[in-house]
Amino acid sequence: MLKLRLKRSGRKKQPSYRLVVMENTTRRDGRPVEQVGYYNTITKESYFDVIKIKKWLNYGAKPTQTVLNLLKKAKIIDQ
């Protein structure tokens, strides 16, 4: 099953995350199917490719709870 997940990147103690589409059995830092955005926890900067996110949600990908909260905050989805 496909999931919209956060993949950690950045330096030690300075995390930033990439929003990616992955199989749910893949490791956190494994190879994604596609990258659809990023989120920097230090500067609170984020970018989400709305077209790609909606495409993968229509294909049946499920967002994790953290990703769901980020997408709601960015007003991409409203549930």
Curated annotation (Swiss-Prot):
The keyword Ribonucleoprotein applies. The keyword Plastid applies. It is found in: Plastid, Chloroplast. One of its GO terms (cellular component) is mitochondrion. One of its GO terms (molecular function) is structural constituent of ribosome. Keywords: Chloroplast, Plastid, Ribonucleoprotein, Ribosomal protein. Its main location: plastid. Gene3D superfamilies: 3.30.1320.10. It comes from the Eukaryota. One of its GO terms (biological process) is mitochondrial translation. SUPFAM superfamilies: Ribosomal protein S16. Pfam families: Ribosomal_S16. Belongs to the bacterial ribosomal protein bS16 family. This is Small ribosomal subunit protein bS16c. It comes from Trieres chinensis.
